[in-house]
């Protein structure tokens, strides 16, 4: 069984794949007569290719149990895809760089709970891996014509395990 190591989600580690959406380290702008803090420009939403438009959706992820077998990844070649959790439950993100899928470059991250992610256009990723309970996410992605989904099976399964999750203190 080939196990994926799991890393804590940080902006620096995730930068090759897109953006981490979080308030920590974000530019803050007080608005509305100082009664609201705006955390500004948290992700680069990129959905305009081939006349695309932004969609705002709610995804309800069923919890996955570990060990969890990763057998495939998907990508959206025409637009980014942002996931913003509506709870503070950690979830796992599995990604690989854009371009031809190279299974040796697959990485896994665990969020702190409130962190969101924005997958850059063309980045390979696994569908939502919620942990513990049913979890809701606001998802901003692309609507419009054109084929914006590719799925690819991995040459061999990779596993996410409790031990790998515990190794990062999650």
Swiss-Prot record:
UniProt keyword annotation of Thylakoid present: no
GO biological process, one term: purine nucleobase catabolic process
UniProt keyword tRNA-binding, yes or no: no
Reaction equations catalysed: (S)-ureidoglycolate = urea + glyoxylate
A GO molecular-function descriptor: ureidoglycolate lyase activity
EC number(s) reported in the record: 4.3.2.3
Pfam families: Ureidogly_lyase (PF04115)
NCBIfam families reported in the protein's UniProt record: PRK03606.1-3 (NF002950), PRK13395.1 (NF009932)
Descriptive protein name: Ureidoglycolate lyase
């Amino acid at each position: 069984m080939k196990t994926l190591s799991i890393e804590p989600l940080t902006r620096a580690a995730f930068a090759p794949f897109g953006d981490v959406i979080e308030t920590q380290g974000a530019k803050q702008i007080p608005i509305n007569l100082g009664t609201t803090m705006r955390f500004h420009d948290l992700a680069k939403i990129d959905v305009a290719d081939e006349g695309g438009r932004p969609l705002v959706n709610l995804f309800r992820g069923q919890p996955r149990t570990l060990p969890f077998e990763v057998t495939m990844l998907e990508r959206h070649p025409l637009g980014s895809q942002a996931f913003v959790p509506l709870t503070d439950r950690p979830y796992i993100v599995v990604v690989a760089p854009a371009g031809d899928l190279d299974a040796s470059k697959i990485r896994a991250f665990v969020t702190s709970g409130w962190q969101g992610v924005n997958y850059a256009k063309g980045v390979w990723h696994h569908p939502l891996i919620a942990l513990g309970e049913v979890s809701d996410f606001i998802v901003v992605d692309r609507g419009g014509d054109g084929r914006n989904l590719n799925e690819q099976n991995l040459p061999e399964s990779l596993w996410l395990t409790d031990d790998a999750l515990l190794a990062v203190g999650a």
